[in-house]
Every structure is written in C-alpha cells, then in structure tokens.
Amino acid sequence: MAETILRLQNISKYYYSDTSVTQALRKINLEFSMGEFVAITGESGGGKSTLLNVISGMLPFDEGEMYFRGEPTFQYDDQDWEEYRRNKIGFVFQDYSLINHYTALDNILAALVIQGKDPESSKEEAMAYLEQVGLTEQAAQRASQLSSGQKQRLSIARALAKNTDIIVADEPTGNLDSETGEQIVEILERLSHEKLVIMVTHNYDQAEPYVTRRIRLHDGEVVTDVPVNKRDENVDQDHQNPSEGEIKSNSGEKTKKKHLENFFALKNIKMQKGYTGDGY
C-alpha cells in the first residue's frame, strides 16, 4: 500500500477583516498518499485554493493539525515553513512564475542552484528535466519567447528540478486552450506515478480521465472525496525516503549561498537580502 505522506486533521482556516471573520476551511480531514493524482474541485470561493495553500505551506492553518510523514507541523516556525516550501513542495502556478529573460535551461538551473548545486555541472541534469516535458529544442529560448503551453511545461520542469515528493498545481491549465491543457494534465498524470500531485481545477471534465481521486469543496467543507481511476502499480520506493530534503549543514548552506551568488551575478541580478527562492 502506498505511503501516506500528508494527513490533515480537523483543519480550519479563517480570514479576518476589520468588520468580519470568514471561515474558509471547516474541519478538513484528508489523507494523501504517494502515487496519487488528486483533483480539487468546487465553485469559486469554496476553499480550493485556500486548501492548496495550506497544504503547500503558503498559508498557516488556524485550527487542527497537518502531519507531514507522520510528524505534526503545528509548531513549525517561519524557518521550518520556509524549509518545507523549499524542499518538500514543487509548485506549478497558473501564471507560470518564470524568469522571463532567462532561457528555459537557465530557469531550471536556477532551481538547481537554489538547492546548492553548481550550475556548470548541473546542465545535463537540467536538460533531463526539460526532456521530460518535451522542451529540449527550446532550451536556449528565453521564457518570454515560449508559447503559453511551453511556459507551463517549463514551470512543471522547474517543479521537477526541486526533486520533491509533492507537486501542487493551482489551475495549471487555466490560461491554455483545451488541447494544450489536456497535454499538461497528461504530463502531471505521468509524474504522479512516483509522486503526490494535487491540482486545483475548474475544468474537471478535462482532468477526469487522468486523476485518481476527486475532492470537491463547498463553503469550505469536503462534500465529495471519491477514487476515480484505480492503479495497480507499485509506487517507486526511491521516492519515499523520509530523509530526502532535510535541512543542510552549515557548510552545505555556505556552498549553496556561494553557488547562488555566482549564478545570479552571471545573470546580472542583484540578490535581495533574505532571498530564499520560494516557488523555485
């Protein structure tokens, strides 16, 4: 049986304003396992993106507990959540969030450098990620020159380069035509055989042939949680190593910082104090 990697227990989330309090999530109880491709659906304002942002560590939850590989996260401080986002979650955004004046290859190298890898010795690895999404011929093109579908493929390749067990995708096909969108969903399905992929979508008809599970939210509550397409294959155990992505030693952090400085200096980008590469 596939390993449970995430468990949400009675998770609630509130949004506060000067005059009101809105409960965005209401006592959510869910478990997610490796090898799943989960579609989160529901009407606008139902809590889909809030749930995804809580899962990915982008938003704190207010009540309940979220367990990552059996360990509670309620006591995480800012540094713990930063490490979680950086080393545990691969992000695929609707707006791509690429560095537009970088080439496709350099966008992937940036993700590898943030992990402390040397850019020169990582080019072969970066090309391998581009190959997985069918972008080897576009490696030397700037991100700004790519089509919308190619940009989303590049966004997926960048998420792959983080080598995380979890990929979250927020409306990854929202800016794409139906044919290109289906290609993106197909790529995510292929990746989900060795990872957990969680996707928010308004177009469930497009996703239905590919996902293994559908969760539907209404007014912040789970109203549907059903399996869709069963899989019999075993998940690759290489992707179930609890120690992967642990916080590096001080010497490793120094090496990582040096690679970051060198890489971004070459690209004529001034690193802002405190830059951590969240989203990369």
Where are these regions (language model features)?
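Conserved ABC ATPase signature
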Residues: R142-L146, Q150-Q152
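Helix-to-loop junction immediately C-terminal to a conserved catalytic motif
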Residues: S56
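Conserved signature/switch motifs of ABC ATPase nucleotide-binding domains
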Residues: R86, Q141-S144, K162, H193
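The feature captures the beta-strand-to-loop junction immediately N-terminal to the Walker
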Residues: T41-E43
